[in-house]
């Protein structure tokens, strides 16, 4: 009898959890606040499950609870649920505040990333033809000093670790990302805008 194929991607692990515990985890729609310490419950329930390792489980759970959809669900008075969907305790004001701060920081990073992307796109766009004669010459504005380019340094795959902050080279613009998983020659990362992607090790750099 062949062994079941192990789940290596956080997305697949979350889908599997939603399948095994539908009253607790969801992959779309409103999320439910999870019981504090639910990882221990998961590890115990899936102790004999060869499809999911504890390491993958922990990474997937962190990814799930840091998603905007989940952070929106953490509101004062909302009931946290266990793996069977049973209400166990209410979300405190302190926990809601922490969730809101995390959400605010995440949105700010995405906005900053989009702003940088738009600036880069504007620089690459061809300049429009200017009319030969203009009624009034516009006053020249002082040029802003150019931002220093980020210096990148190569990094070996075996020197990377889950949770490490890295730079991903996509085109000419390096993007900040967090390492989620390491798999042979590939590295799964989460960009600041929340997008999860898998890239080759030669696309991963560190700030010099």
Curated annotation (Swiss-Prot):
Bilayer-crossing residues are none
Amino acid composition bias (Basic and acidic residues), ranges on this chain: 99-115, 126-135
Its predominant location is cytoplasm
What InterPro entries does the record tag this protein with?
Answer: ProQ, ProQ/FinO, ProQ/FinO_sf, ProQ_C
Cite the Gene3D superfamilies for this sequence.
ProQ/FinO domain
Query: Pfam families of this UniProt entry?
Result: ProQ (PF04352), ProQ_C (PF17516)
Q: Write the record's keywords in alphabetical order, separated by commas.
A: Chaperone, Cytoplasm, RNA-binding
Q: Name one GO molecular function term.
A: RNA strand annealing activity
Please note every region of biased composition (Basic residues).
137-149
- Could you identify this protein by its name? RNA chaperone ProQ
């Amino acid at each position: 009898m062949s062994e079941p194929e192990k789940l290596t991607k956080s997305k697949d692990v979350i889908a599997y959890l939603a399948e095994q515990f539908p009253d607790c985890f969801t992959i779309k729609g409103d999320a439910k606040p999870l019981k504090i310490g639910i990882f221990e419950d998961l590890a115990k329930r899936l102790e004999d499950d060869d499809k999911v390792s504890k390491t993958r489980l922990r990474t997937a759970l962190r990814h799930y609870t840091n998603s905007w959809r989940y952070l929106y669900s953490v509101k004062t008075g909302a009931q946290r649920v266990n793996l069977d969907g049973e209400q166990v305790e209410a979300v405190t004001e302190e926990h809601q505040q922490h969730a809101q701060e995390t959400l605010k920081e995440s949105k700010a990073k995405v906005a900053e990333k989009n702003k940088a992307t738009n600036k880069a796109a504007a620089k690459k766009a061809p300049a429009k033809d200017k009319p030969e004669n203009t009624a009034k010459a516009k006053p020249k504005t002082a040029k802003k000093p150019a931002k220093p380019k980020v210096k990148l340094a190569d990094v070996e795959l075996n020197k990377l670790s889950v949770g490490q902050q890295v730079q991903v080279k996509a085109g000419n613009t390096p993007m900040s990302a967090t390492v989620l998983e390491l798999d042979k020659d590939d590295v799964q990362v989460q960009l600041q805008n929340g997008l999860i992607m898998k890239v080759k090790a030669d696309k991963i750099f560190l700030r010099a």
